[in-house]
Amino acid sequence: MESQLYLVTKFGPEIEEKGLGCVAQKKIKRGTLILREKPCLLQNINTTGNNDYFDDIFTAYEEMDSDLKDRFFELANFYDHIEESNVYHIGRRDVYLTYLEENPKPYPEGVALKVLQIVDTNGFHNGVCLEMSRFNHSCVSNAEYFWNEDVNARDVRAIKYVFQYDLCFLP
């Protein structure tokens, strides 16, 4: 997972809770395209209601090849931490489990639940991008993302000068 502008890397033990992040491999000027990526899991942004939303997620997931699914399951899952403490967003787990009970999938419920959790953790308004999901969040970001309709991909651009070895952050 390397490009000329950034490297996805694991942080050292001093900030281990961050996991992976994107580090600039050279100076990046404001306005520079850092990443253009088509989502591995593309969703219809016009779905209404939980069932349509979840159906759309599983349709996209089931269209992935096995390599893409493996990479998808390597993404962060906010719920791993939550399951240890058993503190969920109010009712979210119940919504997931009710949907899965009413709409069983041809794979174990645990896999289906993990799909929903990973989308919730890494999704942007119309899907999940494997590389872009490795960019960390900051309220003081140095890059921004948007949907590029001309190429049907998500673009990440520097919004300020990024020095070599700085982390690239998204809002």
State where each predicted segment sits.
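Conserved catalytic SET/PR domain of SAM-dependent protein methyltransferases, capturing the structural core
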Residues: 1-171
